[in-house]
Amino acid sequence: MIPAHDPGPASGLAETLPAIPASAGALIFDRAGRLLILKPTYKPGWTIPGGVMEADGETPWAACRREVREECGLDVRQARLACVDFRPPRPGKPGGLRFLFDCGAFPDDELAAIVVQPEEISAYQLVPVRAALDLLRKPIRRRVKAAWRARGTCYLENGRPVPGVTQ
């Protein structure tokens, strides 16, 4: 219900709204359909390019582009939203929203020029999607698998499709 009179920011409404952390990731392919995956230095397993949105009001799309540029030097110019995943809070973890963008196939010369950020990334590889699913960390694996299967935009909760929401 919308109040008849909006008291404005002094009402304290902003302080009662949830602060939801968010991150954005990128699905980047080569012309053969292989997926770019990265091996982070700060956690086990493989992941995709991406990371946390900045607290200064950065948008999911801007975060995706920034993280890809920082982590592997690629310039993402276009994409489609592949997935939004709501992760509920857990003990020691704030939860939040995870955005996944399908950035399409990059030209071979751009992929050959990848330069990883050595403080964060120790290796990268282009692998068939099915093989990538075996290598990716579990939460990201679910998201990538759902987006790959949907071939369109999907909505997930905790990495799983939601009954009643068309995928």
Indicate residue ranges for each PLM-predicted region:
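Acidic, metal-coordinating catalytic segment for phosphate/diphosphate chemistry
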Residues: 1-25
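A structural signal for short, well-ordered beta-strand segments
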Residues: 24-26, 81, 99-103
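Conserved Nudix-box catalytic region and its N-terminal flanking loop in Nudix hydrolases
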Residues: 30-70
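Nudix hydrolase/Nudix homology domain
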Residues: 44-46, 118-167
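Short, solvent-exposed loop/turn segments at secondary-structure junctions
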Residues: 45-46, 85-89
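Unchanged
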Residues: 53-77, 87-139
